[in-house]
């Protein structure tokens, strides 16, 4: 668990979104946080870092959200995140441990 520094104006905006979601029956509010803006340029600049394989894995979910506009469905398999397209009805889904056959057996990150 960590924290992010935000201004009062930004925290007020976050609070309004969370309160609105809860008031309208949403049970969970997923937060997808990334270590930096995951542009191609930033990924290249950090490609030699020891965390690069992990960041490459996160970028898959980042790009899926950017493409679809809905948070992806996330599962964990053998030490890595697995992302699938999300739907508005699955926004409050929890992360689950599930290994699709194309991921099972790979070396964990």
Stretches found by the model and what they are:
Residues 1-105:
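Exported/periplasmic cell-wall-interacting domains
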Residues 108-109:
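N-terminal targeting segments with Sec-dependent signals, encompassing both cleavable signal peptides
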């Amino acid at each position: 668990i960590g924290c992010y520094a935000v201004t009062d104006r930004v925290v007020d905006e976050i609070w309004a979104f969370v309160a609105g979601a809860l008031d309208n029956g949403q049970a969970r509010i997923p937060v997808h946080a990334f270590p930096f803006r995951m542009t191609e340029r930033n990924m290249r600049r950090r490609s030699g870092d020891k965390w690069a394989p992990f960041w490459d894995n996160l970028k898959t979910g980042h790009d899926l959200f950017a493409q679809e506009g809905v948070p992806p469905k996330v599962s964990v398999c053998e030490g890595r995140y697995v992302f699938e397209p999300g739907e508005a009805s699955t926004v409050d889904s929890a992360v689950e441990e599930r290994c699709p056959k194309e991921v099972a057996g790979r070396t964990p990150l």
